[in-house]
Amino acid sequence: MKVLYLGCFCEPTISTFIKECTKGVITVSATTFQKALLAGCNECGIRPDYIVNVPDIGSFPFRCNNLFFSKSKFEYASIKGVNASFFNVTYLKKCSIYHTIMREAKLWLNKNREEKVTILVYSLIYPYLKAAIDLKKMYPNVQICCIVLDLPEYFGDSTSLLYRFLGNLETKRIYSLVPSVDSFVLLTKYMREKLNVGLRPSLLLEGIYNPVCIVPQKKRKKTILDFYRFDLTD
C-alpha cells in the first residue's frame, strides 16, 4: 500500500517567502503539527510516499500581499512533494485549491494505479476533503483517511455576518462529505459521535511529543511563601 499525504503546511523552502508576504500574525499550529507528524512517520519508517501541499496562508488582499503562488518541488522528512500553485484571492481561493489538488494528485495517482493507495488528508478543510473524495470516485484503488483536530463549526473567528453565513454553509457541505471517508485519526473520543464514525476504523491521537525539542533545565531551589509566618493583624 502507498500513502499520498494531502497537507497544508509551510514547509522550509517556502517559509521565508510566506513570512515576507503575510500581513499580521502567521498561524503556525497547523504547520507545527504536520511537520511533527511527518518527521515522526519518517523516524518510524512508515512515511507517506508523496506529498501534495497547499500552504496554510492568509488570502489576498487583506492578509497577504501575494495574489498567486507558483508550483514548486520540495522534500521534507525524506518525503518528496509538491507545493501546488493556486490563486490566493479571497473567496476564489478555495475553488483554486480544489482544482490544483486534483491536478497534482492525479499526476501521481496515474503512476500508481496498480497499488492500493490511502489518501491521508489533514483536517476537514472543504477543498482538500472534497478533492480527496472526488479522487476516490475516479480511482477504485483509493481510500481516504482524515486527520481531525477540530470540527468545522469551530473553524475561523470572524464576526462578519457574511463570513459567518458562508461558514455555516460550508460546515454543512463538509459534514455531507464525511460519510465518504473510510477511516479517521481523531483528537478526542467525542468526535466519533459528532462525525458519526460508527464502525469505521478510527484512532485517537492525544498529541505529538518530540523529545529533541525539550531543553534540559537545571533544578532550582523553590521558594515557597508561607502565609502562616505573617501576622496579618498589624
For the regions a language model picked out, list residue spans one by one:
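Short N-terminal targeting/anchoring amphipathic segment
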Residues: 107-128, 140-145
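Membrane-proximal helix-turn-helix segments that form the acceptor-binding/catalytic region
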Residues: 35-39, 134-138, 152, 164-184
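N-terminal subdomain of nucleotide-sugar transferases
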Residues: 1-69, 114-115, 183
